[in-house]
Amino acid sequence: RRVWLWQNRLIPSVFLLFLLPIFVFAMIGVPLKNVIRYSLAGVSYDIWVFPGLIFILSSLSLYPLLYREFFDLRIHRKVLVNIALTPHSKNKIVFASLVVAGLEALVVASIGTIFYTGLIPIVLTLPNLIFLLCCLVVYLLLLGNLFISVSLLIDTLTTMSLVMFMVFLLILFGNGFLIEFSFFPLGFESFLKWQPLSLPFQSYQ
């Protein structure tokens, strides 16, 4: 079904596929580079923030796919009949949707990686790239499960919007993607370091 949707919306989809990495870099990476010149370890900020931009990019790509599948279609009672009547269990359907959405997010992240390595003076070796992808897969599975759980538990658009706003605040600022944990108060820093979404990124760093 995702292939069919891509085929019927090929030009807009490809346009957004390449526009999103540029937009994220222009709106987040470039301004913060002029504010935070170096990390606390003395690494140039544009190099330090590179993996964080990839994780943010994949997060932004993952959310719309799962939101539509598990919230929008559900509350508007537009679940496709062939999906509702499938002989597969609900767990398999949810897992399949998560995998497909994760693969699409990985494609966007890969395009972003190629784009950013052309702009940022960073050298990625093959082992580093493979480990980055492994950490990204674990992160997307955790984040995807969070998105799905929230989408299934909430039935009103207003509540969903507020909750997802808080989730994205956590994604942007509470995982060490853009600013280091040391900038937070000690107790809150420990909480952020040990919350599940931040662990894959910390493993890569």
Where are the regions that the model predicts?
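Hydrophobic alpha-helical transmembrane segments of multi-pass membrane transport proteins
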Residues: 46-118
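Alpha-helical transmembrane segments and their short interhelical loops
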Residues: 90, 94-164, 169
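A short amphipathic helical element positioned immediately N-terminal to and/or at the very start
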Residues: 1-8, 203-204
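Hydrophobic alpha-helical transmembrane segments of multi-pass membrane transport/permease proteins
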Residues: 8-34, 47-63, 106, 166-173
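Hydrophobic alpha-helical transmembrane segments of membrane proteins
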Residues: 31-73, 134-153, 171
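Transmembrane helix segments
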Residues: 30-32, 153-194, 198
